[in-house]
Amino acid sequence: MLCPWQFAFKPHAVKNQSSEEKDINNNVEKDVKVHSFVKDDAKLHSLSKKQMKMSPIITSAEKHPQNGIKASNQISRCPRHVKVRNMENGSSLLDTLHLTAKEVINCRTRACQGALMTPKGLVRSTRDGPVPPAELLPQAVDFVKQYYSSFKELKIEEHLARLETVTKEIETTGTYHLTKDELIFAAKQAWRNAPRCIGRIQWSNLQVFDARDCKTAKEMFEYICRHIQYATNNGNIRSAITIFPQRTDGKHDFRVWNSQLIRYAGYQMPDGSVIGDPASVEFTKLCIELGWKPKYGRFDVVPLILQANGQDPEIFEYPPEIILEVPMEHPKYEWFKELDLKWYALPAVANMLLEVGGLEFTACPFNGWYMGTEIGVRDFCDVQRYNILKEVGRRMGLESNKLASLWKDRAVVEINVAVLHSFQKQNVTIMDHHSAAESFMKYMQNEYRVRGGCPADWVWIVPPMSGSITPVFHQEMLNYVLTPFFYYQVDAWKTHIWHDETRRPKKREIKLSILAKAVLLASLLLQKTMAARPKVTVIYATETGKSETLANSLCSLFSCAFNTKILCMDEYNISDLEKETLLLVVTSTFGNGDSPNNGKTLKNSLLTLKLLRKNIRYAVFGLGSTMYPEFCAFAHAIDQKLSQLGALQLTPVGEGDELNGQEEAFRTWAVTAFKTACDIFDIRGKNSIQLPEIYTSDDSWNPKKHRIVYDSQTMDLTKALSDIHGKNVIPMKLKFRQNLQSLKSSRVTILVKLSCETNQEVHYLPGEHIGISPGNQPELVHGLIARVKDAPPADQTIRLETCTEGGYWASEKKIPACTLSQALTYLLDITTPPTQQLLKKLSQLVTAEGDKQRLEVLCHSTEEYNKWKFYNRPNILEVLEEFPSAEVSTAFLLTQLPLLKPRYYSVSSSCDMTPREIHLTVAVVNYRTRDGQGPLHHGVCSTWLNKIALNETVPCFVRSADGFRLPKEPAKPCILIGPGTGIAPFRSFWQQRLYDLEKKGIKGGDMILLFGCRHPDMDHIYKEEVEEMKRKGVLKEVFTAYSRQPGQPKVYVQDILQNELETKVCNILHKEEGHLYVCGDVRMARDVAQTLKRMLVKKLNHTEQQAEEYFFQLKSQKRYHEDIFGAVFPHEVKRI
């Protein structure tokens, strides 16, 4: 006979825990269990002691039975509580509730499994028979105890009577049934115990619908329809659960096959694309195979597939009127409606299992209401879902080709704004993720007060956006399983035993033996096919990961026809070089033309090789920035070395400019390399190879996709620039401008002072950068407008619109509504030489055959293009003058010209010394192209700052430069090296030190300035101010290098560094742990670094390797600071 009392008065754990069951928090045995039925235990014991002898309750003071295990082998018992801390406010909570945890959900191995989607401990599989009574009874007793413990007043008699009833029912039938009140209690507790739910603060308000009398799938459907209508409530969403009959023997289960009651279909098309929700593709196929007629829309609600009493499933379509959907719109962006998005109002999970006291309810759909990010981030933005992020970013005019622009973050915020706005406008319940996080913190604190714990899965609780600015991010959490509980289940269609085999979806079942043979055969055929293909090795070197991304893309492309593998350069064995058939190299250039760190080994190994015994083929693509003179230098060095070794170049070196269409350039180069390789290696069927989608986009200009419409609004330049660049642009005024060079000098360096409006403030630190958004020269703008065939009136505001795939016109958000003159002056880059991609599109607009032929050569020959570009350095107006038959439209310029990027300058003032002002030191750039014989070109920003009138607006913003700040310890000595305008940030340094000395009484450490210029009477800028700083004790010593004194040898800063400051520099850096700052162009910085390394070799008796390591340590310790800018003008042009 079954006896409940042996379980009723034991601790919470019924059976002795073996070493296999570990506590999920401490990974030790659960030797201690807390008795959850605390109040009046003695009374209940006295009532039952006639029937049985009560087993002692285990406490932490009692000794464990030996059980034949040596004491030395015992695992220490887990603590009575675990402390969870809040990193934000320093508070802590003590969790004891976890001691009653039921399951081991993960982390029983050495590898943490906390981020797995469905750990084994959270999944319940099917059963082959009923739960044995001996297993069921203790779980039933435990649940009954939990239920009666929930009452404020004890109901001992009712509790005992219920225990006897349950015991008899299990004894006679093998199972038992919950009362309706117990079912309601269980459902609410299961929600309360759900560790992955952030919205549990509403757990006690759950509406429970008891559908245990249901017999058929049709009745299930009727219950679910009533559930949806109740829960939707015209948008005022109410949480509810419908519970169908419990599992009996595992062969008569009730199941809802859908993962959610409402979900959109996903249709896999023949070309591999998906219409609708990609997450629903598999289930949608199942619906179609079961007889549902697809509609092939983006937002088709899939039907319900319901299984009653273990029978084959039936399919039901919802009446349209019971599904509430919310069309998406944005409070600011009108074009958001044009995306034609919507979402259903009711989130209802349908495929989980409710476990209560050993009973399993396999069909129990339940709902809450949406948190905005569930739709706005996961459903709309996940790559594997609707994936609208890039489209939204494009419409917002964001730089989606540059991750550092944070375009994804800006776009996802606006998408979530749209979701919240749309639901609120339709009066449909939704909660933003910040409010949800706040409510969870309140719930968690209350649960610790009431229950002594709160199971929570941090990975799921923290919302998918905003991270550490939500309070839950900073809260430690314990994750454990209590009972009652909602478990995951294996998809029903994967386990269902069909009664009518004719209705079974076609699974194309194959016997295991046949399948094994087929797999083996396919494997052998694949190996044979791959072995027959020419081998290609792709190697890459990277600092930021961009080269690796492109190398993987290249590998995918070549895998269409070649046997490819990919390696990082530091994994590549140089001895394999002669074994290669085709070697593809993708690499960035680091610093002053050096290799990335993971390319140095290969670089050194290549230098040791003399000649290859086999003629391999190769191709190289380089990434870099044309701001620097050593653009793609490492890529060219590899190309040159491989050529010297006798390797054959497949295609010319490709170059990807970070500032101008890098990915476009890579795709063009990659396709060219692939097609050339297919020709050389005579690949069969090369003309019918299906390339990856990324390589098949059309680069041609289609004028029918764009149009210009007139607009009445005027552009707010500051707001427009803020939106375009994602910066807090401040409209400052030009207060003062002074030429710092002598009037006898042919060059100009200006001190620019900008001031705030009276109602504004600006904050910055010495050494930080100021971004200036300049204007292009009026002469250039007017000349360009004169070449536009459909230029609108000068003062007419225009708006660019693009035709979408659906055929409607949408405003293009790359640039706002403005006049053409404003766009060409402030928003678009008209001075940078056009890319090959732009020239290719321009070739469509020329009418003269000669122009067309020349443009075709420039488009397809990288060598010719580079010669042309570096010799002419043409702006877009000069290009149109070179190809006079080109007829460009307003839409062409607005869509094809790149955005005008801000120019950055080191701040030359102290915010404390000159509040509400920004001072800049600017070299005005003028140069002639074509070896000095070409047209006169001007630096965009420097010329603009030198020509605008006083009090004219200068849009600017502050950019942090964390690596170029004064020492945190003011007493540390500093060496400042800055020739020319490299002195700019050091002026902010000495002004700050002077302010600290005179206003705060803080005496800074020794500061030595090493300046360089051409001639003492020409361009020795800030000479008097520097002398004053020396007199006041702010600067201890000042050294100046003059490179153009008549009759004197050229002296540069690195010469003085080595000849006059060798001992001093080594003492400051090595003994006094001081700081060294270098500001200037990249060549000077490289020379200073090399000089310093030679000094270290000499003064510290270091080897070259040790000097390199010491130099690296200085940088790591943030005691060697560089503020380096690219060459102001390239080698091929001559400055005047």
From Swiss-Prot:
Its cofactor is heme b; FAD; FMN; (6R)-L-erythro-5,6,7,8-tetrahydrobiopterin. Induction: By treatment with lipopolysaccharides (LPS) or cytokines, but not in osteoclasts where they are induced by calcium and PMA (phorbol 12-myristate 13-acetate). Residues 536-674 form the Flavodoxin-like domain. SUPFAM superfamilies: Ferredoxin reductase-like, C-terminal NADP-linked domain, Flavoproteins, Nitric oxide (NO) synthase oxygenase domain, Riboflavin synthase domain-like. Heme b binds at residues 197, 488. It holds the Pfam family NO_synthase. FMN binds at residues 542-544, 546-547, 588-589, 625, 632, 658, 662. It is found in: Cytoplasm, Cytosol. GO terms for molecular function: calmodulin binding; flavin adenine dinucleotide binding; FMN binding; heme binding; metal ion binding; NADP binding; nitric-oxide synthase activity. PROSITE patterns: FAD_FR, FLAVODOXIN_LIKE, NOS. The keyword Cell inner membrane does not apply. Keywords: Calmodulin-binding, Cytoplasm, FAD, Flavoprotein, FMN, Heme, Iron, Metal-binding, NADP, Oxidoreductase, Zinc. NADP(+) binds at residues 747, 981, 1014, 1043-1044, 1050, 1052, 1054, 1087. Produces nitric oxide (NO) which is a messenger molecule with diverse functions throughout the body. NO may serve as both a paracrine and autocrine signal for modulating osteoclast bone resorption. Also has nitrosylase activity and mediates cysteine S-nitrosylation of cytoplasmic target proteins such COX2. This is Nitric oxide synthase, inducible. It comes from Gallus gallus (Chicken). The lineage of its organism: Eukaryota, Metazoa, Chordata, Craniata, Vertebrata. The gene is NOS2.
